[in-house]
């Protein structure tokens, strides 16, 4: 290796030349999320938490609000401390107290890696971890930021500059961050993953149709989504009306909850779809519903890398998605599903009609999609990549043992 290359590869964030870390033993990781409500980020953190090799990693799983359905999956897992740092608001006095608690927790437990997921954990915990002397800090960004306010994007960019690594789950997010001025060499991409699905369900099973009061042979189209502006559900409803004009028996399920649920229900009624579209709210049996669906649609206006898309493909359901964010990284258009432009009900309806009227083509896409998930988006692969990233950073030039790191007097008071 040339001297210049050696210096470049062993120069830390403060400009000091260091040899790789000789850290041995288990790596202690503190992960922080907002809550345990079911969502893409929370599901991925749960998957990693359950999958990390306990002989090599000692996981601490922190949150800001100790609520959510995924807690039950973790309750049976032994030896995972789950501290809560309830700040209430970033601007409250409580935030200062919780910051001191977090800094003390990092030092008292000898944490090697602090890994935050999402806007508020990033803004709160990254600077605290840095000031507390955490050897490695990773900030995760899980979407393209279209839903964020300008000040939130600026704040997150400033905070993430303090991290050793910014972890994203799609190339599209990486490209967006680079355009916003993030340093490309600090960004790593590890895509979302799903567990293998039970594909034994049959469209002939009456369960979902009987439950909804529909004909046993009705074609069923599903949308799995949080109900907010960026999910494009209003365009799906317009497309559903067009589909219903040609396939009168078609029925539509919108599975999920959110702030605009009532508005969307009113929109469905205004379109004459009250008897064809059902908003189920939150469901814990998504797998069963998917097994009996003919088609899954993701009409988003913006995406990172959609768990709903992965889950649908893993279940062997043909998919249609908008060509935004990380969707083209999951769906190969015309091979493992169909991609359509966002905000285009006509194109979406045409794609839905194509797959509903050509079941052999839909089955071919479904088989290719489930194979793609098995090969590229397994939880085992994702966990292995996370473990490799942790090891790489701990062995890298930025690693400073916690005992040797300077600590701000503020956190010692």
Placement of each model-derived feature along the sequence:
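Short His-centered aromatic/hydrophobic patch
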Residues: 116-124, 141
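A conserved mid-protein helix/loop that constitutes part of the nucleotide-sugar donor-binding site
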Residues: 42-50, 219-245, 252, 259-266, ...
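N-terminal strand-loop element at the rim of the active site
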Residues: 6, 20-27, 31-39, 43-97, ...
């Amino acid at each position: 290796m040339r001297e210049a290359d050696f210096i470049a590869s062993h120069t830390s964030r403060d400009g000091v030349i260091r040899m790789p870390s000789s850290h041995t033993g288990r790596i202690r990781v503190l992960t922080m999320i907002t809550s345990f409500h079911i969502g893409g980020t929370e599901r991925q953190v749960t998957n990693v938490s359950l999958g990390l090799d306990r002989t090599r990693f000692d996981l601490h799983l922190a949150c800001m609000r100790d609520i959510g359905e995924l807690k039950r999956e973790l309750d049976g897992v032994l030896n995972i401390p789950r501290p809560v740092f309830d700040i209430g608001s970033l601007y409250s006095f409580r935030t200062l107290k919780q910051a001191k608690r977090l800094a003390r927790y990092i030092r008292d437990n000898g944490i090697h890696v602090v890994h935050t997921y999402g806007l508020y954990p990033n803004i709160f915990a990254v600077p605290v971890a840095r000031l507390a002397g955490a050897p490695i800090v990773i900030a995760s960004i899980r979407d393209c930021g279209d839903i964020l306010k300008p000040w939130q994007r600026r704040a997150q960019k400033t905070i993430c500059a303090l991290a050793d690594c910014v972890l994203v789950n799609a190339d599209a997010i990486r490209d967006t961050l680079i355009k916003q001025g993030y340093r490309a060499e600090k960004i790593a991409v590890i895509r979302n993953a799903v567990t293998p699905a039970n594909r034994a369900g049959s469209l002939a099973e009456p369960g979902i149709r009987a439950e909804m009061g529909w004909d046993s042979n009705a074609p069923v189209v599903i949308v799995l989504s949080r109900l907010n502006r960026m999910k494009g559900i209003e365009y799906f409803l317009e497309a559903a009306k067009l589909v219903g004009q040609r396939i009168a028996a078609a029925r539509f399920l919108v599975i999920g909850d959110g702030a605009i649920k009532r508005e969307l229900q009113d929109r469905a009624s205004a379109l004459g779809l009250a008897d064809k579209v059902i908003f189920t709210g939150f469901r814990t049996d998504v797998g069963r519903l998917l097994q009996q669906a003919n088609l899954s649609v993701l009409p988003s206006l913006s995406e990172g890398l959609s768990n709903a898309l992965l889950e649908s493909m893993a279940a062997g359901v043909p998919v249609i998605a908008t060509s935004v964010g990380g969707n083209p990284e999951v769906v190969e258009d015309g091979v493992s599903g169909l991609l359509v432009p966002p905000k285009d009900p006509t194109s979406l309806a045409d794609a839905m009609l194509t797959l509903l009227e050509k079941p052999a083509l839909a089955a071919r896409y479904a088989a290719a999609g489930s194979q793609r998930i098995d090969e590229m988006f397994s939880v085992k692969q994702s966990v292995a990549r996370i473990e490799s990233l942790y090891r790489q950073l701990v062995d890298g030039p930025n690693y400073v043992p916690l005992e040797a790191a300077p600590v701000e007097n503020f956190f010692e008071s």
